[in-house]
């Protein structure tokens, strides 16, 4: 049985912000900002990692239907490689908050640091398992990114992206070594860089 967070904790015009995708070797980092409506309860909100895929999908639709405002944003692979993953994540969070159709009086950010925002903000460590709005944001971000990685499975077969979602599992690392990086792999990440350099070495030896 999955028990959700207490919806009575929801405050007026407080945005919850979270990210998914800092650790994977490929794909964008996806963020979401959500302002919940205290008058429209959503049961079962929790850290997206603690929910089944089916529950996340159901909550995704309910959050989109009932939230006062939400925005899903991202930083692309090129931005991650240019800025580094931390700065790209901060940029994506900034985009999510700025994309809200309603201006929050406060943004609560999952983690231990905040992006530069035009509204007051505070970090909340493990916020996705404490603050309903952050939990909602974690669900929107994870479902969005998981759907993208499942789509990439069809575009780049052989890597198992629909299963590991880009994380550095043994299956992914083996495929990376065997097939080489794709255009959506983050070349600033060490395993990808090593695979790229190995491929370059093979190419050079064949010339």
Swiss-Prot record:
Cofactor-binding details, from the entry: Manganese or magnesium. Binds 1 divalent metal ion per monomer in the absence of substrate. May bind a second metal ion after substrate binding.
Required co-factors: Mn(2+); Mg(2+)
Example of a GO MF term: RNA binding
Reactions mediated catalytically: Endonucleolytic cleavage to 5'-phosphomonoester
Compartment(s) of residence: Cytoplasm
Chief location category: cytoplasm
Coiled-coil intervals: none
The RNase H type-2 domain, residue ranges: 12-201
One GO-annotated biological process of the protein: mismatch repair
Key words, A-Z: Cytoplasm, Endonuclease, Hydrolase, Manganese, Metal-binding, Nuclease
Similarity field: Belongs to the RNase HII family.
Protein name: Ribonuclease HII
Organism this protein belongs to: Pseudomonas putida (strain W619)
Lineage: Bacteria, Pseudomonadati, Pseudomonadota, Gammaproteobacteria, Pseudomonadales
